[in-house]
Amino acid sequence: MIARLAGRIAEKRDDHAIVDVGGVGYLVHLSQLSLASLPPPGEPAALRVYTHVREDALDLYGFATEDEEAVFRALIDVKGVGPRAAQNILSGIEARELAQAVAQGDVARLTKVQGIGKKTAERLVLELKEKLVALARAAGPARAGAEADVLEQLRTALLNLGYRPPQAEGVAEALRDSAEGRPLDDLLREALKRLRG
């Protein structure tokens, strides 16, 4: 089983990236949020990986964060939700936000995500509420402080520049750890560099 890949980004596509590790290119399926957080091609990157083995294929699903991987693994335990569907769901909602919606039983919020109908949303709440409660608590009721403000401004700026919400959210999440004390224009430059790569 492959659990982690560290190498250089060779290519970025709509729903996957190719990671070059020692001259071997691994095709890794990624959510839009994780894909947006990757550096441009040629730059080093490390991804957490879930290896899905089928009779006729071996697929790799990658994650930029531990939270996204945890939610993905919980999602694929739900009847009727496979790895591809779980990845599509995580392209439409950030992992901690999904965990909060499930923990709060917010079926209306879940059905706004492409790929989640009412029955699936109810099943997610029923089957995952206990599993995701710790992650939902870690997310807290709201992001607070100056870091949250500058990240929200970054998201808004990216949306105004024409980027899709999952792209804006993904790159903002990727820059969260380095956002403290940095001005918006500095973060925006780095975000645009990542998105254009």
UniProtKB/Swiss-Prot annotation:
Family annotation (InterPro entries): DNA_helicase_Holl-junc_RuvA_I (IPR013849), Hlx-hairpin-Hlx_DNA-bd_motif (IPR003583), NA-bd_OB-fold (IPR012340), RuvA (IPR000085), RuvA_2-like (IPR010994), RuvA_C (IPR011114), RuvA_C_sf (IPR036267)
Gene Ontology molecular function terms on file: ATP binding; four-way junction DNA binding; four-way junction helicase activity
Gene3D superfamilies, per the entry: 5' to 3' exonuclease, C-terminal subdomain (1.10.150.20), DNA helicase RuvA subunit, C-terminal domain (1.10.8.10), Nucleic acid-binding proteins (2.40.50.140)
Primary residence: cytoplasm
GO biological process, one term: DNA repair
Region (Domain III) residue spans: 146-197
Residue ranges of the region described as Flexible linker: 141-145
Stretches for region Domain II: 65-141
Ranges where the record places region Domain I: 1-64
Keywords: Cytoplasm, DNA damage, DNA recombination, DNA repair, DNA-binding
SMART domains, alphabetized: HhH1
One Pfam family per UniProt: HHH_5
Gene Ontology CC terms, in alphabetical order: cytoplasm; Holliday junction helicase complex; Holliday junction resolvase complex
Assembly mode: Homotetramer. Forms an RuvA(8)-RuvB(12)-Holliday junction (HJ) complex. HJ DNA is sandwiched between 2 RuvA tetramers; dsDNA enters through RuvA and exits via RuvB. An RuvB hexamer assembles on each DNA strand where it exits the tetramer. Each RuvB hexamer is contacted by two RuvA subunits (via domain III) on 2 adjacent RuvB subunits; this complex drives branch migration. In the full resolvosome a probable DNA-RuvA(4)-RuvB(12)-RuvC(2) complex forms which resolves the HJ.
Described function: The RuvA-RuvB-RuvC complex processes Holliday junction (HJ) DNA during genetic recombination and DNA repair, while the RuvA-RuvB complex plays an important role in the rescue of blocked DNA replication forks via replication fork reversal (RFR). RuvA specifically binds to HJ cruciform DNA, conferring on it an open structure. The RuvB hexamer acts as an ATP-dependent pump, pulling dsDNA into and through the RuvAB complex. HJ branch migration allows RuvC to scan DNA until it finds its consensus sequence, where it cleaves and resolves the cruciform DNA.
Domains: entry comment: Has three domains with a flexible linker between the domains II and III and assumes an 'L' shape. Domain III is highly mobile and contacts RuvB.
NCBIfam families given in the database record: ruvA
Family: Belongs to the RuvA family.
The protein's name in its UniProt record: Holliday junction branch migration complex subunit RuvA
Organism: Anaeromyxobacter sp. (strain K)
Record lineage: Bacteria, Pseudomonadati, Myxococcota, Myxococcia, Myxococcales
Gene it is expressed from: ruvA
